[in-house]
């Protein structure tokens, strides 16, 4: 009988939720939900130097905003933070020490640095050289006594089988093999402060929580042989590993970097700008995976049903901010007006634009939105001075037919009663100008749009004129004549 599917997302509370970590969480979530398994959240907080206050809450809040839920977490289960599990780690440290599979190391940082320097000068690959090498039992005992008398606190190192072969069949990469001699020698599993190192603690946690599959970024591939060594030393079966490809900047082809200012890389940024979480979820789900076919817009339920780990890409996933914004715009265009208005309302309020026409303005510009914060610059026409025309717009307005069109349309607006001044009645007035003047197409619509809004392109012209108001529209046209 196969093991129950149990996967985990194990963030460090060291800052905001990055798009790469969000993808790790999302793929684990999709895998668990597709197979009817459990999705576990565990907090890896043993690196106290990098600990950020409120980092854990921020991670969980942003996951929830994305639409990711979980079955187990520190909120509902005890000892799901590594800092609460130190006694468990110590139990296995003691076991490995007692079995001779690990040992206490008294070498100092200064000695390690000097040895690295010597190795580099000699053209050797830096590695730890066992400090007890060549010592007799008496010499070893004397060395330890001397170090302890000097107050040196030891680390604990795992004794590496240099001749060992560590291999696994990766869910994404296929068969991967590492030689034990290539991990840099016996490595530290417990630091001087008593905290375990990452590669030791993660094995204890995954085994204790019965994790069946470890799905993570391929920057963890080099960690896997070390983790397999711990599984071997403790006599445990390792989980199935899957390493997702890097996320690269679509413009540079290089690994996504915090210096890439042309991309929004943290989920908090998308929240603050008023993106629709469903759109961000959809976009991230396609970073390194696709269900086949041409379709790109999927609901969460569809993605769960379609998720097939065999379609995880072996090639780097290109992060394209323009693609993200296109996808977000698709969601805005098809969303309920009430939901879009709720997203836009805080931005309009902050800009002092929460008037009685606010919801109508949102409806007008909804098809153009990729994020709710865009509603403020889009509505400048209704709250700011008339914009300066561009050279292209001035060229359009210099055509000899423009005065004829504007004068005729201005007269149509002036003749309309307040009761008749509605979007559905404005378009027939434009068509009447066409009939009377014989001017049509761009030569008709473009001058009216530029005269009214100061822009060549925009939302539906009758709605723009209606929301701007009859008097304001007439004034704008008059200023162009």
UniProtKB/Swiss-Prot annotation:
Complex and partners: Monomer.
Motif ('HIGH' region): 11-21
Motif placement: 'KMSKS' region: 255-259
PROSITE patterns: AA_TRNA_LIGASE_I
Pfam family, one: tRNA-synt_1c
Gene responsible for this protein: gltX
GO terms for cellular component: cytosol
Originating organism: Streptococcus equi subsp. zooepidemicus (strain MGCS10565)
Name of the protein: Glutamate--tRNA ligase
Residues reported to bind ATP: 258
